[in-house]
Amino acid sequence: MAEEIIIRTEKLCKTFSTGGVQQHVIKNLDLEIYKGDFTVIMGSSGAGKSTLLYALSGMDKASLGRIYFCGRDITKLSSDRQAIFRRKHCGFVFQQIHLIDSMSIMDNVLSAGLLTKQRRSELTKRAKEILKRVKIDEGLWKKFPNQLSGGEAQRVGIVRALVNSPEVVFADEPTGALNSSNSDAVLDVLTDINKSGQSIIMVTHDIKSAGRGSRIIYLKDGTVCGECRLGQYTPGDTARHDKLKAFLSEMGW
C-alpha cells in the first residue's frame, strides 16, 4: 500500500536579501512528507532546516515553487488565507514556548484552538484528555506559566499544538533549552503522539532527539543530500542508533 503524501514541494526556493545581496537558502527543493511519519530534518548550521520548516507550514512565504499541503497549493493563498489554513491544519512547538504569563495553563492551551472558532466546550474536553496524557497534573491547570518547570512548560506547549487536531505538528528544536531529564520527557510525548498517528516534522541538531524519528532528512546548502528510514522508535534498539550514526557520518555530520 502506497504511503499517503501529506506535504509535497515542487522546485521550492527561499531567498533572503541582506544588504542588497541575495542569499539562496532553499534551492529547487522537491520533497514529499508522508502522513503518520515522524520526519526529522537535520543538517549543519545554516543548511536551511528552520527555513524549510517554516516554509512547509506556510509561516514563511516561499520565494518560488509550489507547496501542496493536504492536496492544496498553499503558495497560491493570500497571507490572510494562509493564516487561516495554518491555524486549522498546523500545530507548532518551538524551543522557546512563549506561554502567556497572565493566562492560566488551561487558557494558554485553549488559546490556539479558539482562533479556529471551535466550540470552547469541545476544545476543553480535548485539552483535558491531552494534558492527562502528557502527565500534566490537574492541579497545575489553573496555575500560571511561571509556576512550571521547563519540561512542564514544553509539554504544555505540545498540548497547545495538539488541541485543534492538526494534520501536522511542526517542532523546531523542541528540546534545545531543556536538561537531559526534561528533554527525554518531551521526546517521550512526541514519540507517543506519533505512535497514535500524528504526523510530526521536527528540526534538530541533536542525535538523541533525531533517533526518535521514523525518517531522517539531511539538508546541505538548501537541498536534500540524503535520507534514512529508521521506522518506528523502540527503546533500547541499538541497531537503530548505529544505523543513524552511520548515515550521519556518511552525510559528513
Question: Which sequence ranges carry the predicted segments?
Answer:
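Conserved catalytic motifs of ABC-family nucleotide-binding domains
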Residues: 165
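Conserved ABC ATPase signature
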Residues: 144-148, 152
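Conserved ABC transporter NBD signature motif
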Residues: 65-73
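Conserved beta-strand-loop-alpha-helix hinge in the C-terminal portion
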Residues: 223-248
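Conserved ABC ATPase "signature" region
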Residues: 72-73, 110, 121-139
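Catalytic Walker B motif of ABC-type/P-loop ATPase nucleotide-binding domains
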Residues: 169-172
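Short coil-to-helix segment of the ABC ATPase nucleotide-binding domain corresponding to the Q-loop/switch region
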Residues: 103-112
